Every structure is written in structure tokens, then in C-alpha cells.
């Protein structure tokens, strides 16, 4: 009696979305110089899914469809892994941005406690204090850019949240972090040269600042561990130093340094940019502003939370999230994508999709009163297993800053056209810095 041999099913045939026409070099340079405008034009020409060839990432499938975004964000890390290259080029191999699979899951579990529960209440006071300190010297009745002030507030707040009390080392970090973030944000969008051009090159300057940063962090870790009250400290560094993985192991000194730099950089520029946009938007929407001031005076917060959500949608600061295909093929909706391709979720285009957000150009916090936004259409923090670990902290910080400013200042409205978006490499900020006129109440 002969055996019946059943053949393994053939893998799906590769089927890619429409391909963008044009040489790889042109697509890559256009992506670096003006990616938001470029991707918007491609969506209008090719639809909500298309294939491109981008200098730094190679072959990519770009999607601007919430249903496809849902599938990407809910796929396992074994199917869709970390895009290459990623921001670990800036922060180091010990950053959560560098990790994948089990290592990434373990690290996120370790990082979660400082950004949830009781820890968050401790940070509210810090943020309010830093807001009052920064706004004490605001000009009265004169236009000024709010973005630099927001950068100061968010940097000082995250420094105090991470390290506790101040000191000379924190002053050194205040000197190092802003230029590092500005340069690093721009270099993140560019391929890294294989040759080392020394300290005078942009990458060389970044490396030199990193060496200075590491020296400061070593001193801070030593001081933290030597503190007689170390076991009772609630700052992020103390929580990280006391935390252990499931097997009892602890984070290495290098990993702590990389992770702290990630929190300092990623946790300050993006939040500051969103706050700058918030003041820019509110100054041009008097009805929303008046309702927010009334709510603040009455001790409410629902509309303020909705306004923060709407700013993050209408003026998206981080415009894409990405994954890399690991299996031989990955089926995304009707498309079949081969291994080695990357998938880019076009956050900015999804946030501006009229099928998802009616009248998307209208600034309307009422969209979120009484209902939560879809986690796969409203995605300023990305989604899935790689969603920003500090999202709750960032939203709380924005809430406290707006509440404090509106409680103490009158924001004058204007009929001027809205500010254009300015790309800083990774983040998009108001081109004129969110210029407004304030008067103390």
C-alpha cells in the first residue's frame, strides 16, 4: 500500500502596492528634505498603500489606512520586528529603541513602573513648579515664541523626575542635552557615514557630547547609590537601579545610560513641540480658548484633555511609525510583502483622513468629548508593543502645563494665519515657535 504524501502549501505570491516612480536617490533625498509633503503627495497619487525605495530604509510599503495600521500594530514582534536603522544610532544599543523580541518585552516591563500609578502624582508637582518658574519672566503684552519656554519646562521637569533634586551635574546636562537633541534629531533622518571624520564632523560632535554625558551619568549613579535614603527615593533613576528582571538580573551601567538618554531626549522635545502647537492653535480659536479658561477656573479637565488629543491629531509631531518584515512573506490586507521590506505607518496622513476625522482641517476638541479616539486612527505615540512607554507621562505633563498657564495668564487671540510646520529631523514644530501674546491675569 503506497503512502500518500501531502505537499506543503505554497507560500503566497508576493503582491505589492503600486510602486512610486523615480530613482531611489531622488526618493531618498526627497524623504530627508520634505518627507511629510512627499508622502502626502504620494498618498494622493497612489492611494493609501504604496511601495517606495528610500535611501536609508530601502524598499518600504507605506500605509495610510487605519485598518492596515491596526493589523501592523497587533502583529507579533516575531512577524514584524524593529525597523533598521532606528534611533538606537542616537541613543545606543542599550536603548529600548534598539531592542526587539523578548529583550524588548523585558525592558518595557522594567521601565513601566516609573510612568504609572503613584509615581505620576509625584511628577505633577515638579511640572507645575517648573512651569511657574519658567513663566515668571514671560514678557507681558509682547509677542514671543513659546517653544523655547516649553523646551525649558519639559527638560527641567524630566531631569527632576529622573534624578530627583538638582545639582551641578544637572546643570551640565542642561547644557549638553539641548544641542545634542537638535543635532541628533537632524542626523536621525540621514544615513550614518562609515568613515569617522572626527570631532569637527556632525557625528563626531554628537559622539563627543555623548562622552561628556556618560561622565555626568557615572557621577549621578554613584551619588544615587551612596544616598542613605536610596531605598526610599522615588525618582526614575532610583527605580531603575532598584529594579530587576524576572530572572533577578539588573540593568547594566551602559543600558541605564542609554535608556536615560532616550528618556531625556525623546521625553522632552516631542512634548515641548506639542505644547508649542497647543498655544498656536488656541490663540487662533477663541471659542475653544474661552471654554478652556472657564473650565480651568471651575476645576474641570475634560475639555483640556480633549484639546490635547486634538492638538496631537491636528498638528502631528511624530509623523510615522515603522516595522520590518521577518517571515518569508507577510500578508497585510490584500498585499503580500516579502522579508526584508519595511512597513511605514503614515501617522500624519491617517490623522488628516476625512473618512476617519470629518473636516480634518478643523481644530475641534469636541470630537473627543464623551468618546475616546480609535487607538488605530489616533496614533501620535505609535501603537502595539512599541507604543511610547512615556505616553501617560507626556499627556499628564501637557495637561499640567496648560492648566497652570491658563490659570495665571490671559492668552490673546489672533486672526493671523496658522504657523506652518517646520521639520527638525524627527519632530515637527511650529515654524515661528508658537508665537503668542500673554498677559498675567
Swiss-Prot record:
Pfam families: p450
Entry EC number(s): 1.14.-.-
GO molecular function, one term: iron ion binding
Record keywords: Heme, Iron, Metal-binding, Monooxygenase, Oxidoreductase
Classification via Gene3D superfamilies: Cytochrome P450
Keyword match Heme: yes
Organism of this sequence: Mycobacterium tuberculosis (strain ATCC 25618 / H37Rv)
InterPro entries assigned to the protein according to its UniProt record, in alphabetical order: Cyt_P450 (IPR001128), Cyt_P450_CS (IPR017972), Cyt_P450_E_grp-I (IPR002401), Cyt_P450_sf (IPR036396), Cytochrome_P450_monoxygenase (IPR050121)
Protein's UniProt keywords contain Iron: yes
Top-level class of the enzyme under EC nomenclature: oxidoreductase
Family, per entry: Belongs to the cytochrome P450 family.
Protein name: Putative cytochrome P450 138
SUPFAM superfamilies registered for this protein in UniProt: Cytochrome P450
PROSITE patterns, sorted: CYTOCHROME_P450
CDD domains recorded: CYP110-like
PANTHER family: CYTOCHROME P450, CYTOCHROME P450 12A4, MITOCHONDRIAL-RELATED
Residue numbers binding heme: 388
Lineage: Bacteria, Bacillati, Actinomycetota, Actinomycetes, Mycobacteriales
Cofactor: heme
